[in-house]
């Protein structure tokens, strides 16, 4: 009677002899703990998953669902893992681990291109482990390194992503990224990690220790990878180049975001209104429109903003700071966008043209205001008397009639006015 299969493990394509060898090695890898679902599951990041073809994706889904079903049938799994729930709903498996992947981004940057190229070239097959063979204890075959040969420069190759290593210890350490193994524990804080170096790095969060200091600007960092990334600001190094247009970037994540301009891909969709974005950060900010959340509040006047950058820009109104200076005329501005618009004055550039009368404007906001002349639209209405205006500034000026506010004082005689134009007219009396 043939053995009944219990666990199917997807792995990179190999010859029958190699498959048989891996099967034997797998049986020798029996450990002292019961089989858990994580022992026979494989995680993919979004980038890795998108490199698989339809057949490979289907095989992965079938094997994962079969493995879980078999574990349940012999009483080895009581709760349903999140990845199984996603697969049963027809969703992508990498969604369950997005936050983990994001957290490892700095460590995996150098692996990004190697993984993608390797996964595009490789195919999956299955190793079948029977109930009788396995007893009740196994470990994934991916943890079994290949035999080292003297002729190979980097003999230790990861069968999941194709990355190669000079040393067995590096290879084993790398495998824990795929399998989520965490052998190193920070006893003081009760958190586990896949590498000893990550324990040290985590402890620095609590101690505040930042041993990596930039000699250029003095800024300090808790881990070497963040320090290396920071140094690119000073060196101008941009190692990640777009093969489509040649534009280069400091970080792998920035290249990935940029490439979506060429592909038109917008994977982050708002479930409220359906609007899609190329970056998760853009979606995160967009959601605040629906929730009304404005977490960044000005301590000076209480005005709140959806973005931190908007708060910083606003605060310059109180401080009078204008860090963006025009090199052509010396005029300074409180925001980069205002300086960009100002540059168009020198260039004579007017990008925004009215289709009704062909009048052109430097800024889009000026065009929008101008178009209200043609449409007679007056969106700014006074709550006090109902009078409407085509500009927000006109409404503000009008409301001072009701409030009696006169913020513009004459320095010569102290008389106050409700609008700047009235003050300028008055000052003409003193100058003659």
Curated annotation (Swiss-Prot):
Note the superkingdom of the native organism. Answer: Eukaryota
Q: Which Gene3D superfamilies match?
A: 6.10.140.140, Classic Zinc Finger
Keywords for this protein:
DNA-binding, Metal-binding, Nucleus, Repeat, Transcription, Transcription regulation, Zinc, Zinc-finger
Main localization (coarse):
nucleus
Q: InterPro entries per the record?
A: KRAB, KRAB_dom_sf, Znf_C2H2_sf, Znf_C2H2_type
Protein family according to the UniProt entry: Belongs to the krueppel C2H2-type zinc-finger protein family.
* Name of the molecule in the record: Zinc finger protein 829
- Gene behind this protein: ZNF829
